[in-house]
Amino acid sequence: MYKLVLIRHGESTWNKENRFTGWVDVDLTEQGNSEARQAGLLLKEAGYTFDIAYTSVLKRAIRTLWHVQDQMDLMYVPVVHSWRLNERHYGALSGLNKAETAAKYGDEQVLVWRRSYDTPPPALEPTDERAPYGDPRYAKVPREQLPLTECLKDTVARVLPLWNESIAPAVKAGKQVLIAAHGNSIRALVKYLDGISDADIVGLNIPNGVPLVYELDANLTPIRHYYLGDPEAIAKAQAAVAQQGKASAA
């Protein structure tokens, strides 16, 4: 049996402000830093260790990983930084308040933009300052692969090559793997691993800063998965994520 641990970054400044973040490189709040440190302590106390870690090129995930490694005394563990683990690109919604956007367009439309599988938000113009072109993080990524908006289907297509070419082989080689990423890049992986339908993925919410453990068989098919931490607190955190895109959340 193999184990894989996924963790969404701790609360970011734009999580706190209830804004669509996507590829905008915002940092953690003090609460987010605390959540990440607590996740590291939970993993250490539960006896986990890691041989390799994967994260995105966005600082909220990178810093979360740093905190986890620090608490576990694993700062030496090699880290793979990949744009493929970035948050889903929210296009023209990037930076907008979720509740205000819902008040303008309706809860249902914003839910579709946030959680549907194959409907992307309106795209950025290529000349928009929020577009990824020219960002040194993506200097080695072909321009045609850089998105101006994404739906979850696009995010799955972006994440899976990294899974197939690097993460899955590492797991099969017996390495203990940690992935520190984002709500939607983790949703993409969970959808793939668990075979969740396009319709059912709408209801999946990933809480900030809570380790999600997968136990996998020899074919990397999930045997079971579970969060580490207090179940009641985790349920509240998931409910809060679900509430973010509603007009009443303002």
UniProtKB/Swiss-Prot annotation:
<feature type="binding site">
    <location>
        <begin position="21"/>
        <end position="22"/>
    </location>
    <ligand>
        <name>substrate</name>
    </ligand>
</feature>
<feature type="binding site">
    <location>
        <begin position="8"/>
        <end position="15"/>
    </location>
    <ligand>
        <name>substrate</name>
    </ligand>
</feature>
<comment type="pathway">
    <text>Carbohydrate degradation; glycolysis; pyruvate from D-glyceraldehyde 3-phosphate: step 3/5.</text>
</comment>
<dbReference type="GO" id="GO:0006096">
    <property type="term" value="P:glycolytic process"/>
</dbReference>
<dbReference type="InterPro" id="IPR029033">
    <property type="entry name" value="His_PPase_superfam"/>
</dbReference>
<feature type="binding site">
    <location>
        <begin position="183"/>
        <end position="184"/>
    </location>
    <ligand>
        <name>substrate</name>
    </ligand>
</feature>
<comment type="similarity">
    <text>Belongs to the phosphoglycerate mutase family. BPG-dependent PGAM subfamily.</text>
</comment>
<protein>
    <recommendedName>
        <fullName>2,3-bisphosphoglycerate-dependent phosphoglycerate mutase</fullName>
        <ecNumber>5.4.2.11</ecNumber>
    </recommendedName>
</protein>
<feature type="active site" description="Tele-phosphohistidine intermediate">
    <location>
        <position position="9"/>
    </location>
</feature>
<feature type="binding site">
    <location>
        <position position="60"/>
    </location>
    <ligand>
        <name>substrate</name>
    </ligand>
</feature>
<keyword id="KW-0324">Glycolysis</keyword>
<dbReference type="InterPro" id="IPR005952">
    <property type="entry name" value="Phosphogly_mut1"/>
</dbReference>
<dbReference type="GO" id="GO:0004619">
    <property type="term" value="F:phosphoglycerate mutase activity"/>
</dbReference>
<feature type="binding site">
    <location>
        <begin position="114"/>
        <end position="115"/>
    </location>
    <ligand>
        <name>substrate</name>
    </ligand>
</feature>
<dbReference type="Pfam" id="PF00300">
    <property type="entry name" value="His_Phos_1"/>
</dbReference>
<dbReference type="InterPro" id="IPR001345">
    <property type="entry name" value="PG/BPGM_mutase_AS"/>
</dbReference>
<dbReference type="InterPro" id="IPR013078">
    <property type="entry name" value="His_Pase_superF_clade-1"/>
</dbReference>
<feature type="site" description="Transition state stabilizer">
    <location>
        <position position="182"/>
    </location>
</feature>
<feature type="binding site">
    <location>
        <begin position="87"/>
        <end position="90"/>
    </location>
    <ligand>
        <name>substrate</name>
    </ligand>
</feature>
<feature type="binding site">
    <location>
        <position position="98"/>
    </location>
    <ligand>
        <name>substrate</name>
    </ligand>
</feature>
<comment type="function">
    <text>Catalyzes the interconversion of 2-phosphoglycerate and 3-phosphoglycerate.</text>
</comment>
<keyword id="KW-0413">Isomerase</keyword>
<keyword id="KW-0312">Gluconeogenesis</keyword>
<comment type="subunit">
    <text>Homodimer.</text>
</comment>
<feature type="active site" description="Proton donor/acceptor">
    <location>
        <position position="87"/>
    </location>
</feature>
<dbReference type="GO" id="GO:0006094">
    <property type="term" value="P:gluconeogenesis"/>
</dbReference>
